[in-house]
From Swiss-Prot:
Family annotation (HAMAP family): Ribosomal_eL15 (MF_00256)
Highest taxon above the source species: Archaea
Name of protein: Large ribosomal subunit protein eL15
Coiled coil: none
Protein species of origin: Haloquadratum walsbyi (strain DSM 16790 / HBSQ001)
Keyword Ribosomal protein carried by entry: yes
GO CC terms, sorted: cytosolic large ribosomal subunit
Region annotation (Disordered) ranges: 162-196
Amino acid sequence: MARSFYSHIKEAWKQPGDGKLAELQWQRKQEWRDQGAIVRIDRPTRLDKARELGYKAKQGVIIARVAVRKGGARKKRFTSGRRSKRQGVNRLGRRTSIQRIAEERAARKYPNLRTLASYWVGEDGSQKWHEIILIDPEHAAIENDDDLNWICDDTHKGRAFRGLTNAGRSNRGLQNRGKGAEHTRPSAGSGSRRGK
């Protein structure tokens, strides 16, 4: 049976460090390091993943690549007024994933657009790159698109900040079901002091 073009792309991205994709990624990262933290791009790097998440090559749909530095939370030592237990600086993790941070930064950069979803495209020793799919809710092409016009409704404002994107829902634990997920819905803080 003949395989689709997208299946070949997906297969290559399962191991981006091997084969022809590895050399291509090596060249890309050299260019990406010289660019800014948030860059608008013409077309997605991973076409299969972008299409899977709702991307369409049409007006009103924008892709931005965002670089976020790796590692735990950067925290400064307090100058006064903490007991030793609360003075922690090192070994503190983030409460949000790097992917979610990337979505929020893109949403702040483009306040008139709405975040649809995002996906990983690469990383090196010091940073990770994600591509964010952004939608213009005022564009006529989006308002007339039956697959995307739901995002034009005002209830979808600030999706990235409210944890409603794919990275946000994953970060909130909403992909887990059954035992151990009793306190994740509707949110980790609702009804109990226990979180995820």
